[in-house]
């Protein structure tokens, strides 16, 4: 199959495919109830037409008329559905010979002509359709150009780490510390996650790319990432999740929740693997993202045991790993607020004590949870 997009000099646009087309009965069933498909928020809506309704309706933002012409591979005459912005439509059939498949014809309003300038139009077309599984050709002034990559490197099983890092740097205009693959059963999410090379705050929204059935959905993470995963940038495609009616995000349901849980486990498995097999990379990530690693460890006892010795804590003798703090004494002295720490640090230094400043987010929680898991340790709050 293929998709051909024709941008004419008068800015008329034709989207044409060589698919199986629609019979008159199917045109009537689907197009005359155009809003219906956008309201079906169940997997049953995942049929061969798909959830196209709101997408076709959105054409009325830039045009007063939508024309759909189709001829079915199952036989019958070609049909033409012409919808008007006032809600009326006309459905006709034609004995005229036309190729099997469908095409959508749009005549843009004057106010939106700027979107149909060649460079702007091509940028939008590439942005949304770059990884569609069928070749997309843009035709303009007798020239034809392939504008997508049906087999993108980030979905290629044999792509190397360098290829994935180079692709991410090109797409996001930023390098990454590392990259790893994910695949979920829930929602059939597949792609790669990049580890950001700079510190991030929980309130900052990073740039992502989320595709739904290989078409760009959003540059937000669409709630696919756990709340603590702000050090991760995702480049993923979901074949089994549902979009909202506006096609700006994913429907928040149990399927999305399960997919997010699987992605969270994949991130934890990745970090666990680094601790066991690539300590140098783990240390690089820890240097930049120790705050987020602490957040992960605070909610997962297994990872707490695995990560705790490597996590940095401020003490009156400088920043030290918990492993070095623990090796100094089985009694760990700490303060729970910054003012107390400032008051005792000089006295503690003179007495030769090691005192942890646990005023930072997660630090006291981590100390208490680790002590509960390791009875040989004693916490002494000063």
Predicted regions span which residues?
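GHKL (Bergerat-fold) ATPase N-terminal catalytic module, capturing the glycine-rich phosphate-binding loop
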Residues: 1-115, 316
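GHKL/Bergerat-fold ATPase module in large chromosome/replication-associated machines
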Residues: 48, 67-90, 109-114, 119-382
């Amino acid at each position: 199959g293929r998709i051909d997009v024709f941008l004419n000099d008068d800015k008329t646009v034709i989207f044409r495919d060589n698919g199986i087309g629609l019979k008159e009965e199917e045109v009537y069933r689907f197009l005359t109830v155009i809003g219906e498909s956008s309201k079906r928020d169940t997997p049953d809506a995942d049929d061969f037409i798909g959830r196209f309704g709101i997408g076709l309706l959105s054409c009325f933002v830039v045009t007063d008329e939508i024309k759909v012409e189709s001829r079915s591979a199952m036989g019958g005459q070609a049909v033409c559905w012409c919808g008007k912005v006032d809600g009326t439509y006309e459905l006709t059939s034609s004995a005229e010979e036309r190729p099997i498949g469908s095409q959508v014809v749009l005549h843009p309003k004057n106010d939106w002509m700027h979107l149909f300038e060649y460079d702007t139009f091509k940028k939008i077309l590439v942005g949304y359709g770059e990884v569609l599984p069928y070749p997309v050709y843009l035709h303009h002034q007798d020239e034809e150009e392939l504008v997508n990559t049906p087999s993108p490197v980030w979905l290629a099983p044999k792509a190397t780490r360098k290829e994935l890092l180079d692709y991410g740097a090109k797409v996001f205009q930023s390098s990454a510390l590392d990259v790893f693959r994910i695949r979920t059963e829930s929602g059939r999410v597949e792609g790669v996650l990049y580890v950001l090379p700079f510190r991030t705050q929980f309130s900052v929204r990073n740039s992502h790319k989320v595709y739904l059935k290989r078409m760009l959905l959003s540059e937000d993470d669409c709630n696919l990432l756990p709340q603590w995963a702000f050090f991760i940038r995702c480049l993923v495609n979901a074949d089994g999740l549902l979009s909202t009616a506006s096609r700006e995000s994913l429907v928040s349901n149990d399927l999305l929740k399960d997919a997010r849980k699987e992605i969270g486990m994949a991130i934890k498995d990745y970090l666990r693997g680094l601790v066991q097999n690539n300590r140098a990379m783990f240390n690089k990530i820890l240097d930049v993202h120790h705050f987020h690693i602490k957040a992960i460890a605070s909610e997962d006892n297994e990872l707490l045991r695995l990560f705790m010795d490597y996590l940095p804590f401020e003490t009156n003798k400088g920043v030290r790993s918990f492993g070095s703090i623990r090796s100094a004494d089985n009694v760990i002295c700490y303060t729970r607020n910054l003012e107390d720490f400032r008051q005792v640090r000089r006295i503690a230094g003179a007495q030769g004590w090691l005192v942890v400043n646990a005023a930072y987010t997660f630090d006291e929680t981590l100390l208490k949870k680790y002590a509960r898991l390791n009875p040989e340790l004693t916490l002494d709050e000063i």
